[in-house]
Regions:
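Short, thiol/selenol-centered motifs that function as redox-active sites or metal-ligating centers
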Residues: 102-103
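Anionic-ligand binding patches
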Residues: 120
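Cytochrome P450 catalytic-domain "roof"
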Residues: 144
C-alpha cells in the first residue's frame, strides 16, 4: 500500500513548492494529498494560483505517514500561527512519523518546539537562520535528520521530493531519469 503524504496549504503558500511537489510525489508512487488549513476547498498561493484541496485540516491526519509544510509568504507564517498545524507537527514528531518543511516553513518546526539539537536547513538569510540558534543549521540543499526532512526553497523542490520518495521506501532513480533531472543537473544551464 502506498505511503500517505499530507501537504498542508495555507493562504499564501509557495505554489512551486506545493504543486510541483504534489505532482512529483504522485509520480513517485506516493498517495499525496493537498490539505487546506483555511476551511475552504480552494486555497490561493503567494503568486495568485488557486488550488483545489483533497481534504481539510479539521479531518484527522492520523492515517498519514508524513506531513509536509511548504514555504511561501504569508503561507509559512499562516502555518506557523495555526495551533492545529503546530499540534500535528508535535504529534508526528513524538510518533516518529515523517515531517517535511521547505523554504520558510521550518519556522513552523521551531514554533512547534522540535528543532532544538536537530540538523536542518531553510530559506537562506539571517532572518531565518537566527530562528535556529539551538539547531545544527546547514546550507545543504536537502537535510535529513531522523524523520525530519528540510530543504531551501523553490529551486530545491525536486531534490526535496526525491528525498521524500526515497525516505518513504520508494526509488527516485527511475523518476529522476524520466523527469530529466540528471540531465538538467549535469547541464551548465
Amino acid at each position: 500500500m502506498a505511503k500517505k503524504v499530507a501537504i498542508l496549504l495555507a493562504t499564501g503558500y509557495e505554489e512551486g513548492e506545493s504543486l510541483f511537489l504534489l505532482d512529483t510525489l504522485r509520480r513517485g508512487g506516493l498517495q499525496a494529498e493537498l490539505v487546506s488549513t483555511t476551511g475552504e476547498d480552494w486555497v490561493t498561493g503567494s503568486h495568485g494560483i488557486t488550488a483545489r484541496v483533497d481534504r481539510q485540516l479539521d479531518d484527522s491526519l492520523s492515517d498519514f505517514d508524513m506531513i509536509i509544510l511548504p514555504g511561501g509568504l504569508p503561507g509559512a507564517t499562516n502555518l506557523r500561527d495555526d495551533e492545529r498545524v503546530t499540534g500535528w507537527v508535535r504529534r508526528f514528531d513524538s510518533e516518529d512519523k515523517w515531517i517535511g518543511a521547505i523554504c520558510a516553513a521550518p519556522m513552523v518546526l521551531q514554533k512547534a518546539g522540535i528543532t532544538k539539537g536537530r540538523t536542518l536547513t531553510s530559506y537562506p538569510g539571517g532572518k531565518y537562520r537566527k530562528l535556529f540558534v539551538d539547531s545544527d543549521y546547514r546550507e545543504d540543499i536537502v537535510v535529513i535528520d531522523g524523520h525530519l526532512i528540510t530543504s531551501r526553497g523553490p529551486a530545491t523542490t525536486l531534490p526535496f521530493a526525491y528525498a521524500i520518495i526515497d525516505a518513504l521506501g520508494g526509488d527516485s532513480a527511475p523518476l529522476k531519469e524520466g523527469m530529466l533531472y540528471n540531465m538538467a543537473k549535469a547541464s551548465t544551464l
